[in-house]
């Protein structure tokens, strides 16, 4: 059986990336994952064609198309038990629905792109967990103030209210199969993890679910590992990656460290680069 895809999506502050980090540490070689899409880490022909909001939205839509195609290939890898994605097309559509930025791509245009181009390319089994958080809780969890100027829009209360409305009322109808909706207000990370583990158990991944719930939680916000420091800085540092969310962990013969907006990978030969499952399968160590 091909590996299922688990998508984690929802408004900022819902705990998606923290949950992904716990899953990556717990499941190790049995999983491949996609970090949150990040146009800032793309370059050359892969970069956005125009710096406008519409240009960036088109980049995200095309990225989701490429990712859907890659996931179909990666799901066939016998070494992979589970693929995990921090956001998918829902994140792009949510932004188009909620933003009031000038020169933004119309929501209907983005939705039609999903229906015509992305949906037919999705893998056989896509499980979706929508993590909800109220606007007030979203702001509180993230300290109420943007750490960097470019993140300021994600602290706008009106935007957060519209995102919450999208994920509550609209997003479930845009999932390949009915999603599991988890309200994280007042919930502990262990409670949310247990609900996601239940999604996997219901899909037949009992052993994977047990590994998740039995794994010890690691300390949040670990330091950047020195082996990744140079590449982290060269590719944009905090502005591009955000903060580290896992320590350096062994993965299929190499080492990876997951950050908020990307991950870095060091292969067995000592080459360090951006973690990018779109490029080629990451094989288990011989």
Listing of model-derived features with the role each one plays in the protein:
Residues 11:
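P-loop (Walker A) phosphate-binding loop of NTP-binding proteins
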Residues 19, 23:
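Hydrophobic positions on the alpha1 helix immediately C-terminal to the Walker A/P-loop
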Residues 24-71:
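Conserved substrate/cofactor phosphate-moiety recognition/catalytic segment
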Residues 59-122:
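Glycine-rich phosphate-binding loop used to anchor ATP phosphates in small-molecule kinases
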Residues 143-149, 154-215:
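NTP-dependent small-molecule kinase module
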Residues 206-286:
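Extended, compositionally biased repeat/scaffold regions that form elongated interaction surfaces
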């Amino acid at each position: 059986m091909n590996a299922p895809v688990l998508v984690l999506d929802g408004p900022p502050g819902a705990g998606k990336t923290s949950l992904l980090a716990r899953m990556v540490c717990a499941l190790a070689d049995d999983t491949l994952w996609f970090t949150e899409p990040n146009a800032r880490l793309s370059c050359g022909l892969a970069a956005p064609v125009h710096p406008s909001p519409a240009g960036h939205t088109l980049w995200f839509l095309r990225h989701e198309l490429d990712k859907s195609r890659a996931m179909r290939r990666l799901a066939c890898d016998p070494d992979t038990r589970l693929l995990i994605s921090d956001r998918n097309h829902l994140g792009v559509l949510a932004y188009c629905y909620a933003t009031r930025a000038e020169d933004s791509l119309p929501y209907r245009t983005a939705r039609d792109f999903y229906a015509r181009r992305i949906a037919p390319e999705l893998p056989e089994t896509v499980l979706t967990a929508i993590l909800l958080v109220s606007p007030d809780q979203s702001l509180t969890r993230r300290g109420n103030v943007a750490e960097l100027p470019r993140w300021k829009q994600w602290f706008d209360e009106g935007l957060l209210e519209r995102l919450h409305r999208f994920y509550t009322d609209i997003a479930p109808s845009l999932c390949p199969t009915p999603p599991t909706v988890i309200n994280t207000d007042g919930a502990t990370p262990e409670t949310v993890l247990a609900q996601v583990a239940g999604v996997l158990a219901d899909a037949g991944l009992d052993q994977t679910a047990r590994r998740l719930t039995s794994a010890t939680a690691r300390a949040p916000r670990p330091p950047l590992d020195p082996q990744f420091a140079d590449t982290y800085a060269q590719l944009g540092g905090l502005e591009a990656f955000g903060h580290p969310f896992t320590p350096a962990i062994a993965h299929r013969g190499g080492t990876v460290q997951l950050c908020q907006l990307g991950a870095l990978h060091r292969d067995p030969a000592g080459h360090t680069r951006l973690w990018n499952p779109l490029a080629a399968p990451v094989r288990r160590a011989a």
